[in-house]
Amino acid sequence: MFTENYKNIIKHFDSDLNISKLSNLKKTLIDFSIFNKEIHLDPKQTPYFIEYFLKNIGITVTYAEDPCTHLKLIKNKVEIKGFKNSHIRDGISICKFLFWLEGNVKKNKVISELIASKKLFDFRKKNKLFRGLSFETISGYGANSSIIHYRVTNQTNKILKKNNLFLFDSGAQYLDGTTDITRTIFIGDKPTKEQKDIFTRVLKGNLELSNHLFNKNILGKNLDTIARYHLKKKKIDFPHGTGHGVGSYLSVHEGPISISKNSKTKFKTGMILTNEPGYYKKNVYGIRIENILLVIKKKNLLGFDVLTLAPI
């Protein structure tokens, strides 16, 4: 590993990991070229500078996917058990948060996007195996919920007033697993006919994908159409993929698997990925429902086990 902050990082690892300052990268590549004249690079993962530099010092560059990515995709029994246990704990935190949110809304207490985000964090951090968030929480109310990758700041922070939608997309890193969940909650008691219709269509897509059975030759792009079907009947859609891979106490976005319009992913038992259809009406509201799925065998076919344990 080469990084400018190597002194701060190296103290957290043992001698099995070589960490050096970034300025040593060129020398290391030159030393490598003395005894090695060919190298495999993953074009999706390798910075162009490294490829360019290797070619200039006489190394033959060939291309192949990093084999480590495929080994990570198939979770073993310990990792699967950890995922299930971490989702039980995470689900309890989500339920406590939803109970707190509903109770305080009924009492007309002032709750902002930032307050809600911090409260959810506080519930999660009480878990002994909690190690931090898996990504920065998306906590958006009303118009802010229509921004797919919204990040609340002091300047954009909105109060959760009655009669609009609140979307929170959040996840945690536990020592035994990683979580990623999105829920969309109506604040108040008078959702519009349109909001009820769109929410139902998003929910149908989520549930139908979760319950779908398919053979091993089905691609990610084929499953993607299931999540979009009920929205497309109304001639609307969402501008992102339906799902991404999830690492085991690693990156919450783990490639190369996905469920999206161009995905050529083939699925195998033990893979873990998200299911997150949505709809976003610009500057008005956003709806997304996200669960994590485990690929399993069902009736000589493949299917999904929903790991996320929280009410929709």
Give, region by region, the residue ranges found by the protein language model.
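Active-site neighborhoods and metal-handling regions in enzymes and metal-associated proteins
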Residues: 1-312
